[in-house]
Structures are given as C-alpha cells and as structure tokens.
C-alpha cells in the first residue's frame, strides 16, 4: 500500500509548478485527474518534441495521471466539476490570476460546498498585494527573487539551467498538501493553501539575503565557483577536462595542500590561512591550483582528491547522467509508458523500490475522459452529447 492510496486530486494545471506537485502526489499513490483544454491540452505538451515527438517537460511532470478534457468556460462544466470535487480530497490549480474565482471556484464557494476539500492555489505572487495580477513565469521569478543577481559571471547574470522557481513552488505545494491531509485527519476540515512562486524562491535565497543583511554587499557572482568559500568550484586539468572540488574547513585545506597540490608550505602562507583570506586571494590561489593540475589528468586529480578525502565531482553532461554508474548501481531507472512508447524515468528520491511508488503512464490528451465521466454517472448518450456540444 502506498501512502496516498485512496486520495483523489483534481488538477486545474498547466506548465510546471502545479504539474510537478501533483505528479509527486501521484507517485505516492494519489489518483490525480488532470483537467485539460479540449484539442489543445496543457500548453506544456507543445514546449518541444524531444521525447519521441513529446515534450520533455510534459513527460517529466505528468506520469501516473488521468487526462480529462473539459472546456471550463462551457455551460456544462460547473456540473461536471461539482461532481468531481464532491469525491475529491484535494484541488490544485495554477490558472491565471483570478481565473478560478471567475469560474465559480473561489475558496469561499468551494469551502461552502466541500468543507473537507483541501484547496491549493499556486501563483506567481500571491492573491493580494500590488503584484497579484502580474503574469509570472519561471525566469521572471528568478529575476524578481534576486536569484539572477547572484548567479553567473561578474560580467553577466545567468539563469538556472532548469525551472528552479517552478520546482520550488511545486515542492512547497507538495509539503503543504501533505501537512493539510494530516491536519484534516485530526480536524475533519479542509483548508486553503496559497503558494507564491516569489515567496518560494525568496526562501531559497535566504543565504544571500542574510549575507547582504543591513545593507552589506551581496555575494559576488562567481560563475560555477562558490562566491564566499574557496577553493570551491571547477578547475581545468592537463587533459582538457574539468574537475569540480570543494573545501569546507581547515583540515581539508591542509590535506589539499599536502596530498593534492603536494605543496605543504602553502598551509603556512598567511594569504591562505583562513577561508576569508583564501577568498580574498582567489586569483593568486587559483593560479597555483591551475598550474598544479595542468601537469595531471582529470583521473589523476580525482584520485588525489579521493585519497585526501576532498569532495569532488565531474561536470557531467546529460548523456553522462543517463549513464551514471551510481544511478545504475542503485537501480534508480525504471520504464514508464507514454503515448509514443516506453521511456526511462527516475524513481522518486526516497523511494526504496518501484513497488513503493506509482510509476504509471504519461497520458494522451483526453485519454481518460469517458472513463472518468462514466464514474461520475454519465452514460454513453450523455458523453456523446457533451462531445457534440464541444464541452469535452
């Protein structure tokens, strides 16, 4: 039995933040009914065609869900939604600001009709305040949260390589929903959860915020290196490759000098006697490290780092991650079905094995419409009528 077996989630969702949240609920056993626009669906279906003609974002965030096509603005939609929500435990939505209320799905209306329902609203900026009506996409929230200001090189800010603001919001939505389900078990009452992408990202920005507390200068942009710990970042090796390494304390600094650089005299050099001084003397220390590594291959550098118990990593590309020996050794890849055939998917972190989670198919658009409506009491003639009316 999975943790959320028996829980039903209705999702009015698109893009990444809400779908990422609800996919994880599905991973844990919840039944997730994804409502999509007839003929078009979640617009993330059209982001690209990299996975055998399917969008990479959509394949990632939508396995194990049921797809119901429904025109939310159609006159027939309120009754269908009412029947769905009568049997639901959770409603997750990330529609445009104000759209849910215009559809009659304000929290006040939902609470009156379904007092046990947990309602999770995900938005860019929250339901009030001067930014409440602004559109919000991942990169825009990276900008507003200050993330771009501390990411990249000294010359140019750089965005994260994945949808970090969407992921942050999705994770906080997930944890709040799980907490609300526990709370409902005690009180018998649902509740409203409001997750703002901006607030999720600003929480993740707490270290640079505190670093710049009381008007102090913020952490400098340092590329792939750490802004305030050194050496902690990428270094080239003599065979044209790159090794990432990180030191966290003075014991590691001494081991790095003795066993990796093989220059023990550096431990007595006042320029490098503390992390703060090493950070201030970054250009001089980097030159010393690069000169030493230029005489070694990446494998030799890694061997020395491992012997000295210095944390290190290779900078893998996506092909190398697919083939990562650690993930293979731990059997973290499983096959999931899609409309274009099976593809590999990573077991959810924390899952002991495939039996502990749901890893079902990525749905085709509207694949489950008839079955879901039949479960709500609609007969074949009713469903045909709804199709003729273009409600589904």
Question: PLM features: residue spans?
Answer:
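Short Gly/Pro-enriched turn/cap motifs at secondary-structure boundaries
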Residues: 58, 222-227, 233-234, 245, ...
């Amino acid at each position: 039995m999975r943790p959320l077996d028996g829980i039903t989630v209705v999702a009015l969702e698109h893009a990444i933040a809400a779908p990422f949240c609800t996919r994880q609920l599905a991973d844990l056993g919840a039944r997730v009914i994804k409502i999509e626009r007839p003929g078009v669906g979640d617009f993330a279906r059209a982001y690209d065609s990299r996975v055998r003609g399917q969008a990479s974002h959509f394949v990632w965030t939508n396995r194990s869900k049921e797809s119901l096509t429904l025109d939310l603005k159609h006159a027939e939609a309120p009754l269908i939604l009412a029947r769905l929500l009568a049997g639901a435990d959770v409603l997750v939505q990330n529609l445009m600001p104000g759209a849910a209320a215009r559809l009659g799905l304000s929290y006040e209306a939902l609470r009156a009709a379904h007092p046990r329902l947990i309602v999770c609203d995900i938005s860019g900026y929250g339901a009030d305040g001067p930014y409440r009506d602004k559109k919000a996409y991942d990169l825009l929230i990276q900008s507003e949260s200050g993330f771009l200001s501390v990411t990249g090189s000294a010359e140019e800010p750089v965005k994260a390589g994945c949808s970090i603001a969407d992921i942050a919001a999705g994770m906080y939505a997930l944890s709040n929903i799980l907490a609300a389900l526990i709370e409902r078990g005690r009180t018998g009452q649902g509740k409203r959860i409001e997750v703002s992408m901006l607030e999720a990202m600003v929480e993740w920005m707490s270290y640079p915020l505190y670093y710049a507390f009381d008007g102090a200068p913020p952490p400098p942009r340092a590329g792939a290196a750490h802004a305030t710990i050194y050496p902690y970042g990428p270094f080239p090796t003599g065979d044209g490759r790159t090794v990432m390494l990180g030191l966290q304390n003075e014991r590691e600094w001494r081991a790095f000098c003795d066993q990796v650089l093989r220059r023990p005299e550096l431990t007595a050099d006042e320029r490098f006697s503390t992390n703060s001084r090493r950070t201030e003397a970054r250009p001089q220390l980097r030159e010393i490290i690069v000169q030493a590594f230029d005489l070694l291959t990446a494998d030799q550098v890694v061997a020395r780092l491992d012997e000295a118990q210095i944390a290190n990593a290779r900078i893998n590309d996506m092909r190398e991650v697919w083939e990562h020996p650690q993930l293979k050794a731990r059997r973290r890849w499983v096959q999931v079905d899609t409309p274009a055939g099976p593809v590999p998917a990573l077991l959810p972190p924390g899952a002991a094995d495939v039996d502990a989670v749901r890893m079902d198919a990525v749905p085709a658009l509207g694949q489950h419409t008839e079955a879901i409506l039949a479960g709500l009491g609609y007969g074949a003639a009713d469903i045909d009528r709804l199709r003729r009316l273009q409600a589904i």
